[in-house]
């Protein structure tokens, strides 16, 4: 459906679910809710724990089709302006693509061949460094999220005698916001994810109705101030 259909059907569902008891929402408010609903659905489709079927992107060909418009392959860029001191002396800091939303998989090329990236937490790092052998196993490298002001950055760790030559990421990019009207002309200097003009939904039309339903449920929970309902929205029908 296009943005006009999103807006009109939102009004119908919202009025039905609220029995016309709640005040109507303007186009900016509807756009915020539709965009939030879209991002929540993408996350819940991606994470098995986020949906009632317990299936993630890899478990369902349908989900892979739903997200095909958003899947990209990009390269991380070595951050030469990062602090020269890293927690691990083997680590190199790379900036991830600016439009990255969720990582699917990643790999590095080194002078010893291609290594698959294994994301590790800070506690994982402590545990691994407590072992006698403190290197990634063969064909693997480690990745830790690190501090960055303007970018999403990671520290990549390979074996001490190896050098990274390239870092590739397959990922789901952040979908464009769903904006039903020109925000700058209607509401002044406001944007959603940096966008102020009309913006259509990029996702497969198959899940447009789910986005719409989620947005209406978010609106209902926000109006009623129902914390429990807001929590339950984290796992719905995806």
Swiss-Prot record:
UniProt keyword Repeat present: no
Cellular component terms per the entry's GO annotation: virion component
Tree of life domain: Viruses
Coiled coil: none
Compartment(s): Virion
UniProt keywords, alphabetically: Virion
Remaining remarks: The barrel is composed of five stacked dodecameric ring structures. Rings 4 and 5 are both composed of gp34. Podoviridae-like phages usually possess only one such ring. The tail is thus rather long.
Role played: Forms the tail multi-ring barrel with ring protein 1, ring protein 2 and ring protein 3.
Subunit-level organization: Homododecamer.
The protein's name: Ring protein 4/5
Organism of this sequence: Bacteroides phage crAss001
Lineage, highest ranks first: Viruses, Duplodnaviria, Heunggongvirae, Uroviricota, Caudoviricetes
